Protein backbone atom coordinates (compact mmCIF):
# COMPACT_ATOMS: atom_id res chain seq x y z
CA UNK A 1 0.00 0.00 0.00
CA UNK A 2 1.26 3.48 -0.92
CA UNK A 3 0.12 6.36 1.29
CA UNK A 4 0.53 10.12 0.85
CA UNK A 5 0.18 12.62 3.71
CA UNK A 6 -0.83 16.14 2.65
CA UNK A 7 -1.01 19.49 4.45
CA UNK A 8 -0.61 23.08 3.25
CA UNK A 9 3.15 23.65 3.11
CA UNK A 10 4.53 20.15 3.76
CA UNK A 11 6.72 21.41 6.60
CA UNK A 12 4.69 20.81 9.80
CA UNK A 13 1.81 18.29 9.86
CA UNK A 14 2.40 16.04 6.86
CA UNK A 15 6.12 15.50 7.62
CA UNK A 16 5.15 14.38 11.14
CA UNK A 17 2.46 12.05 9.75
CA UNK A 18 4.96 10.76 7.17
CA UNK A 19 7.54 10.06 9.89
CA UNK A 20 5.09 8.40 12.26
CA UNK A 21 3.72 6.07 9.58
CA UNK A 22 7.17 5.35 8.17
CA UNK A 23 8.34 4.25 11.63
CA UNK A 24 5.38 1.86 11.98
CA UNK A 25 5.10 0.69 8.37
CA UNK A 26 4.73 -2.89 7.37
CA UNK A 27 7.58 -3.74 4.96
CA UNK A 28 5.42 -3.78 1.83
CA UNK A 29 3.96 -0.29 2.44
CA UNK A 30 5.45 3.05 1.45
CA UNK A 31 4.71 6.62 2.52
CA UNK A 32 5.47 10.12 1.27
CA UNK A 33 4.20 13.61 2.02
CA UNK A 34 3.36 16.75 0.06
CA UNK A 35 1.77 20.17 0.40
CA UNK A 36 -1.05 21.74 -1.56
CA UNK A 37 1.04 24.92 -1.85
CA UNK A 38 4.56 25.22 -3.21
CA UNK A 39 5.73 27.91 -0.77
CA UNK A 40 8.31 25.73 0.93
CA UNK A 41 9.28 23.44 -1.95
CA UNK A 42 12.64 21.74 -1.30
CA UNK A 43 12.82 22.88 2.33
CA UNK A 44 13.32 20.67 5.37
CA UNK A 45 10.47 20.25 7.85
CA UNK A 46 9.92 23.03 10.38
CA UNK A 47 12.46 22.73 13.22
CA UNK A 48 9.60 22.33 15.71
CA UNK A 49 8.30 19.30 13.77
CA UNK A 50 11.81 17.86 13.67
CA UNK A 51 12.14 18.38 17.44
CA UNK A 52 8.76 16.77 18.18
CA UNK A 53 9.59 13.78 15.99
CA UNK A 54 12.96 13.37 17.74
CA UNK A 55 11.27 13.49 21.15
CA UNK A 56 9.30 10.48 19.99
CA UNK A 57 12.28 8.59 18.56
CA UNK A 58 11.61 9.42 14.91
CA UNK A 59 13.89 11.18 12.42
CA UNK A 60 12.29 13.34 9.73
CA UNK A 61 15.44 15.33 8.90
CA UNK A 62 15.78 13.62 5.51
CA UNK A 63 12.39 14.82 4.26
CA UNK A 64 12.06 17.71 1.79
CA UNK A 65 8.89 19.61 1.02
CA UNK A 66 7.22 19.11 -2.33
CA UNK A 67 3.96 20.22 -3.87
CA UNK A 68 1.08 17.82 -4.49
CA UNK A 69 0.76 16.88 -8.17
CA UNK A 70 -2.07 15.35 -10.18
CA UNK A 71 0.21 12.37 -10.86
CA UNK A 72 0.05 11.57 -7.13
CA UNK A 73 -3.44 10.16 -7.73
CA UNK A 74 -1.83 7.43 -9.87
CA UNK A 75 1.09 6.84 -7.52
CA UNK A 76 -0.76 6.45 -4.22
CA UNK A 77 -3.56 4.20 -2.93
CA UNK A 78 -4.59 6.49 -0.06
CA UNK A 79 -4.14 10.26 0.19
CA UNK A 80 -4.64 11.68 3.68
CA UNK A 81 -5.47 15.37 4.06
CA UNK A 82 -4.88 17.10 7.37
CA UNK A 83 -7.88 19.44 7.14
CA UNK A 84 -10.95 20.22 5.03
CA UNK A 85 -9.28 23.04 3.10
CA UNK A 86 -6.49 20.77 1.89
CA UNK A 87 -9.02 17.99 1.29
CA UNK A 88 -11.03 20.28 -1.01
CA UNK A 89 -7.92 21.49 -2.83
CA UNK A 90 -6.79 17.91 -3.49
CA UNK A 91 -10.21 16.63 -4.59
CA UNK A 92 -10.54 19.60 -6.95
CA UNK A 93 -7.46 18.29 -8.82
CA UNK A 94 -8.77 14.73 -9.12
CA UNK A 95 -9.09 13.65 -12.76
CA UNK A 96 -12.01 11.33 -11.97
CA UNK A 97 -14.24 10.00 -9.18
CA UNK A 98 -12.00 6.99 -8.54
CA UNK A 99 -9.08 9.33 -7.87
CA UNK A 100 -11.17 11.60 -5.64
CA UNK A 101 -12.24 8.55 -3.60
CA UNK A 102 -8.61 8.01 -2.57
CA UNK A 103 -8.64 11.26 -0.58
CA UNK A 104 -9.56 11.05 3.12
CA UNK A 105 -9.38 13.27 6.16
CA UNK A 106 -6.89 11.57 8.47
CA UNK A 107 -8.83 12.22 11.68
CA UNK A 108 -11.79 10.25 10.28
CA UNK A 109 -9.66 7.19 11.04
CA UNK A 110 -10.52 7.62 14.74
CA UNK A 111 -13.63 9.80 14.45
CA UNK A 112 -15.45 8.38 11.39
CA UNK A 113 -17.62 10.89 9.60
CA UNK A 114 -16.87 13.74 12.03
CA UNK A 115 -14.44 15.45 9.63
CA UNK A 116 -12.23 16.71 12.45
CA UNK A 117 -9.22 18.80 11.50
CA UNK A 118 -5.56 18.52 12.42
CA UNK A 119 -4.80 22.13 13.39
CA UNK A 120 -1.87 23.85 11.69
CA UNK A 121 0.69 24.49 14.46
CA UNK A 122 2.86 26.79 12.30
CA UNK A 123 2.00 30.08 14.03
CA UNK A 124 1.99 28.67 17.57
CA UNK A 125 4.51 27.29 20.00
CA UNK A 126 6.02 23.84 20.52
CA UNK A 127 2.99 22.61 22.49
CA UNK A 128 0.90 22.80 19.31
CA UNK A 129 3.34 20.45 17.60
CA UNK A 130 3.08 18.01 20.52
CA UNK A 131 -0.71 18.07 20.25
CA UNK A 132 -0.56 17.49 16.49
CA UNK A 133 1.87 14.60 16.97
CA UNK A 134 -0.47 12.90 19.44
CA UNK A 135 -3.48 13.35 17.15
CA UNK A 136 -1.62 11.97 14.14
CA UNK A 137 -0.21 9.02 16.05
CA UNK A 138 -3.70 8.00 17.21
CA UNK A 139 -5.14 8.28 13.69
CA UNK A 140 -2.24 6.38 12.13
CA UNK A 141 -2.45 3.62 14.74
CA UNK A 142 -6.16 3.21 13.98
CA UNK A 143 -5.48 3.11 10.23
CA UNK A 144 -2.74 0.49 10.62
CA UNK A 145 -4.88 -1.61 12.96
CA UNK A 146 -7.66 -1.78 10.34
CA UNK A 147 -5.42 -2.32 7.34
CA UNK A 148 -2.66 -4.72 8.38
Regions found by a protein language model. Name each.
Residues 1-75, 145-148:
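Conserved active-site segments centered on acidic
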Residues 23, 33, 55, 82, ...:
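Generic detector of well-ordered secondary structure
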